[in-house]
Regions:
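N-terminal Rossmann-like NAD(P)+-binding subdomain of aldehyde/semialdehyde dehydrogenases
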Residues: 1-119
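Short acidic-hydrophobic, aromatic-tinged amphipathic segments that line or gate anion-handling sites
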Residues: 4-7, 179-183, 303-307
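Glycine-rich beta-alpha junction loops
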Residues: 52-53, 209-211, 240-242, 255, ...
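Conserved small-residue-rich beta-alpha loop and adjacent elements
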Residues: 104-169
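Conserved NAD(P)+-binding/catalytic subdomain of aldehyde/semialdehyde dehydrogenases
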Residues: 175-262
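NAD(P)-dependent aldehyde/semialdehyde dehydrogenase
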Residues: 263-310, 319, 326, 332, ...
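Conserved small/polar residues in nucleotide/adenosyl-binding loops
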Residues: 337-344
């Protein structure tokens, strides 16, 4: 069960602290996987798919027939929503495209700057029991807008050896060039060094678990990466007027990503705190990834009670007021203000 705390009784380091201890052998495991993929290529990827995902893979690359089947069986309303989301994302990222320029400072002196897109980008998309079409759209479309000529996507297959059709539909909608059935650290290694089937890319983007993050860190330098993504985290600021079911759902939207995720609620209502605590116990068993959400909530989850909404809660390096002024928050990755929240 998620733990309740009184803000006055907590030290700042206790608010920030979370148990992110990983398996001690992560580094060694990832080193071994990278070495195997470099040495044996596709053969190693197929063995890891069977070992980690229970999937027997004959052909690593997703065929056009598989993509066509995914579209044929997809709900038309979902496809329309997918296309609308893709259009919105593309519209936003077109505003970020850098402009080339030339300056003629003096006769005979010409200065300028030209932006050239990388040739190949690799996009990692998590798989397993969860499907993240949003990850596909938000990682692939910026590359497409930038003019990247080849976008290679990797994602683990299910036990049936097939990629989630939602992911395939999103990938085709976004403009992925090639899709491969491989995940985890082995997929990162394949994108960095190449295999018989998978081309080596110039940059790898996309989130993943601690093995994926560790692999990205280790191949950085051979290939560019977007960032080392830590475990998911969410801070919900809610008063007594909020719906506890919605608050609990928001917390679980991140808790179900990773057992190391940190779902945190800050409220000035003891009644809401208790209600959310109870609601979490109702909702967690209903989740497909209930075991992961349970580990996250029980280990790293917090409900912090404050006396008045003007109290400041220290989160990472930001001073975030419950009556939040978005312009004063410097480190939040994403701010969502509404009820219910659109988070995931």
């Amino acid at each position: 069960m998620i733990k309740l705390y009184n803000f006055d009784e907590l030290r700042p380091e206790e608010i920030l602290n979370r148990d992110i201890r990983a398996e001690k052998n992560v580094e060694d495991v990832v080193d071994g996987i990278i070495a195997e993929v470099r040495a044996r290529g596709d053969e190693a990827l197929k063995e890891y798919a069977l070992k980690f995902d229970g999937a027997k893979i004959d052909d690593l690359q997703v065929t056009q027939a598989e993509i066509d089947e995914a579209f044929a069986n997809m709900d038309p309303y979902f496809l329309e929503t997918l296309r609308e989301a893709a259009a919105n994302i593309e519209s936003f990222h077109r505003q970020q495209v850098h402009k080339n320029f030339v300056i003629n400072e003096k006769p005979g002196i010409v200065l300028g700057q030209k932006y050239t897109p990388i040739e190949k980008a690799g996009v990692y998309v998590p798989g397993g029991t969860a499907a993240y079409p949003s990850t596909v759209l938000m990682d692939v479309i910026p590359a497409k807008v930038a003019g990247v000529s080849e976008i290679v996507m990797t994602t683990p297959a299910g036990k049936d050896g097939r990629v989630n059709p939602v992911i395939l539909a999103a990938a085709a909608t976004a403009g992925v060039t090639k899709i491969f059935k491989t995940g985890g650290a082995q997929a990162v290694a394949a994108l960095a060094y190449g295999t018989q089937s998978i081309p080596a890319v110039d940059k790898i983007v996309g989130p993943g678990n601690i093995y994926v993050a560790t692999a990205k860190r280790k191949v950085f330098g051979k290939v560019g990466i977007d960032m080392i993504a830590g475990p998911s985290e969410i801070l919900v600021l809610a008063d007594g007027g909020c719906n506890p079911a919605w608050v609990a759902a928001d917390l679980l939207s991140q808790a179900e990503h990773d057992k190391l995720a940190s779902p945190v609620l800050v409220t000035d209502s003891a009644e809401l705190a208790k209600a959310v605590q109870a609601e979490l116990e109702v909702q967690i068993p209903q989740l497909p990834r209930a075991a992961i959400a349970r580990a996250s909530v029980d280990t790293n989850g917090k409900i912090i009670l404050i006396v008045v909404v003007e109290y400041i809660v220290v989160v990472k390096t930001a001073g975030v007021k419950v009556n939040i002024s978005a312009g004063k928050v410097s480190v939040a990755g994403c701010l969502l203000y509404t009820s219910p929240s659109p988070r995931d």
